[in-house]
């Protein structure tokens, strides 16, 4: 598999189900996504693309977002208050960046080349063995 960190990047658009929240993320056409096994990601079917803050732009819907935090309170889970979809959030692993739900990107924006599994159910132990590069 080729190194995706060197691939050219363009702005990809996405959003929530109702369209009230729209964003764009700077990413290559082919990505590696992460599936986390923690309770909130598993129940939501969330598929992560974690990027540094400068590679994320909220286009519309800031006033439609509601935020949920639990456990340490570090992660800020942002949900559309109209349709309930979490299309992005500030992850505990990268509080200076964003995790975009790949499933909320507009169709045809990216191709998922690989899905890496992250044992979020055992977050602390998993973080000692895995480095999340962005």
Describe the predicted segments one by one:
Residues 1-134:
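A short Gly-Trp-Pro
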């Amino acid at each position: 598999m080729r190194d995706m960190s060197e691939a050219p990047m363009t702005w990809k658009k996405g959003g929530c189900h109702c369209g009230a929240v729209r964003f764009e993320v700077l990413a290559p056409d082919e990505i590696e996504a992460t599936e986390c096994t923690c309770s909130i990601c598993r129940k939501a079917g969330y598929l992560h693309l974690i990027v540094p803050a400068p590679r994320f732009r909220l286009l519309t819907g800031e006033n439609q977002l509601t935020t949920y935090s639990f456990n340490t309170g570090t992660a800020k889970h942002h949900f559309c208050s109209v349709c309930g979809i979490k299309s992005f959030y500030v992850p505990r692993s990268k509080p200076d960046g964003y995790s975009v739900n790949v499933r909320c990107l507009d169709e045809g924006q990216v191709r998922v080349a690989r899905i890496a599994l992250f044992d979020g159910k055992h977050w602390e132990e998993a973080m000692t063995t895995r480095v999340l590069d962005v």
